[in-house]
Amino acid sequence: WAVEQNITSGTSKTTFSPNVTCTKAQILTFLWHANGSPEPTAANPFTDITPADYFYKAALWAAEKGLVSGSTFGANTDCTRAMTVEYMWKAAGSPAPAGKADFDDVPANADYAQAVAWAVEKNITSGTGDGNFSPAATCTRGQIVTFLYRAMGK
């Protein structure tokens, strides 16, 4: 599905590497492609990326859309479950969820709490079990594509 939708072409011509931890650059590139790969118009606010980086346009798009901010991008940062749903939620326009995230490990005042509640309402995720969401756990490439499929692929 993700290849057919031009969200990713994999890690090589014959592999996707679903069990590899996804980086910030990768998830934002996936989201940029999932949103049609629009040409960014803003100047580069980041000191740690250049036009030669494969994720350059995705990073600028993410900054324009308010998904990320600051002067450093941190492309190789491991992507967590909280980051994943927050990026997806912001890309969707930050819609207000009807309820709250009902997980023992998601405080109501967490920056990502609304994003988690939205992701549950949209059936993107149901948590990791035992009443937890595991916001600090890293996401694999396979998990992120699964989240995207649940959000957009049906």
Region spans (language model):
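Predominantly extracellular/luminal carbohydrate-interaction, adhesion, and secreted-enzyme modules
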Residues: W118, T146
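Feature responds to low-complexity, polar/acidic, surface-exposed segments characteristic
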Residues: E4, T8-L28, H33-K57, E64-A82, ...
